[in-house]
Amino acid sequence: MSSRTHANGKINPMEIVDAGRFLPAADGTARYVEQLRVPALSAGTYSIPAGAADNQEPHAEDEIYVVVSGRASFTAGGRTIDAVPGTTLFVPAAEDHRFHDVTEDLTLLVFFAPAYSGDPD
């Protein structure tokens, strides 16, 4: 049983998450770190260093990105926009999408619904 679940099997009403891991991988590549997972959703942090590639594939889940810091372009559904702090992006399940032209280290909050079914690490 995880710390997110009471002995009665119900999910705790509140979870405090140490989300201080906004660092890219040691080799300078993009890094996703899952911070929270319950059946209905998962949340994590995604860091892409300036100049690095975003090599993710489409997911089976709906996804929301919130840009915390940095600057990049984002393409999905045939549209490209500037991704800057405060930008919130919704990507439907199975939609091809990508961050590119990362000119400043990019840090994002990421939410999947239902919970991400891929390998979170």
Whereabouts are the PLM-identified features?
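Short strand-coil-strand connectors
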Residues: P39, T75-R79, V102
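Short, charged/polar surface micro-motifs in flexible loops or helix N-caps
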Residues: P39-L41, P49-A53, R71, P114-S117
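Short, conserved beta-strand element in jelly-roll/cupin
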Residues: S47-I48, P58-F74
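Structural motif
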Residues: I64, R71-S73, T80, D96, ...
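Ligand-binding loop in jelly-roll beta-barrel domains
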Residues: A93-G118
